[in-house]
Amino acid sequence: PDIDQVYMAVCQAMTGSGGWPLHVFLTPDKRPFYAATFIPKMSSPNMPGMLDLLPYLASVWRDEREKVSYVSDQIMSAIQEQTRRGTLHDPDELIHTAARRLTALYDKKYGGFSPAPKFPSVPVLLFLLRYAVIHQDRSILDMITTTLNRMAWGGMRDHLDGGFHRYATDTAWKLPHFEKMLSDQAMCAIIYTEIWQVTKQDRYRRLARSVLEYMTTVLSDAPGGFSSSEDADSPGGEGAYYLWSYDEIEKIFGEEARLVCTMFGITREGNVSGMHGMKPGDNVLFPERDPLEILSAAGVRDPEKTYASILNRLTNARKERERPPLDDKVLTDWNALAI
């Protein structure tokens, strides 16, 4: 953990964010000059891949060593300066400073407090929620609800089983890394319960309940406790269990397919095609806002009944696929968090 803390500080200083897996490239005398979190094997339009990045960094070290030395010196100076700074002794001032710095990172368009990849970051949301309630700060409360709405109605949530995927690969919370972890479910259940208690909006009660139902049905371990996670991969590749094509939706729903596609943003071209290895025609369920509101706006008489029917038919269709493997380790810390 101590080593990780050092290099995480380097990554945050160089990129403005951190996360895992963590990659930091060092000079022979252990001075950092490049940092990143997840690096895919192959490059995409938005992200360099490891097979291209390694030769590039090798060429920079070989041909532009002065530039490398300058970058590493700047980073080391910034880290050392940060270490030398005095500590705030006033707890109230420390809390206000933390709130100011976090809200300065807020994504006004899509919610969240970091660039992509976007994690749920529930401890940040819980801190800001308590701050907003104590100080009656409506603007911060709006930041939290916008973030939670985007998470809930984006591709990061499994709209059929109710669980949340590990993180979103893009700023709009559209394409997730499809792994589901018990610790994330526990934290998401907590934040959606607490925001429901504060706002009294029933959508948050429903969302908290759906996460808990996923935990108690899919992750529940027979002897007691909860399994650790569901894998991102299934026999068809990463995320294949969760992806849909336009033709599949037409086959399942017939004349109702247009309504379903509109509600979930499904297109013939695919709403995630080309993103991080997704194929043409690949779609995630991506309503962007509460599906009940979408159905009401479309003139559906009984939105709740219609939505339940749509989810049921999609769930039955997905049961024909092979589910991703379950990691059935029962971890004490994650179970304590869940319970």
Predicted regions and their residues:
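Replace the tail clause
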Residues: P1-L337
